[in-house]
Amino acid sequence: MMELAAKEGFSTFNADNYGGHIDFRGTEEGIVGVIGHLDVVPEGDGWDFDPYGGELIDGDVCGRGSTDDKGPVIASFYAMKALKECGYTPKKTIRLILGLDEETNWHGMDYYLKHVDRLPDFGFTPDADFPAINGEMGILIFDIVRKFDPPGSKGLELSSIKGGTAANSVADLARAV
């Protein structure tokens, strides 16, 4: 994506492959951030086609990450490209910020934020739904520790619990031992 943007004449910044951005330079001070990510949760089972193939089905591009968040990122980039090709120059710089690990922990974005020269004055994310998502969930990973010793028993022990492939996806199967 960064190579394509540079080829189209946009300035780019790559934070050592932890994240980056594409700038459509404005004529005045200020940056509007358009924030997206290019990673996906694991594909899981049950696909009728290649989940990473970007299949066109009934006029829609379908596949893992097509709405969260590759589709919105690509649409944002092509909107910037179309404006540029029409001769439009924005007043504020439009910065398309590209994260690479939103689905896990955003540590790459922490790295990006430490290395970028200037943060946006405000921003939005064109994530997954039109016309807007008014709130986003977060990721909370935690351990629950509790002694399980019902009265009259010799005690039970939960030695492991496993399920799913990512902390922010719904597991199709879970197992407790």
Feature-to-residue mapping (PLM):
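Short coil/turn connectors at secondary-structure junctions
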Residues: 28-33, 57-58, 89-94, 118-122, ...
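Midchain, well-structured core segments that form catalytic/ion-binding scaffolds
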Residues: 103, 109-177
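Alpha-helical metal-binding/catalytic segments enriched in His/Glu/Asp
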Residues: 34, 55-104, 143-148, 173-177
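Acidic/His- and Gly-rich active-site-bordering loop/insert found
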Residues: 1-64, 85-90
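Acidic, glycine-rich active-site loops and adjacent beta-strand->loop/helix elements
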Residues: 38-40, 94-105, 126-131
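General beta-strand structural signal in soluble alpha/beta enzymes
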Residues: 13-16, 63, 96-98, 124-126
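General structural feature for long, well-ordered alpha-helical segments within catalytic domains
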Residues: 1, 14, 30, 72, ...
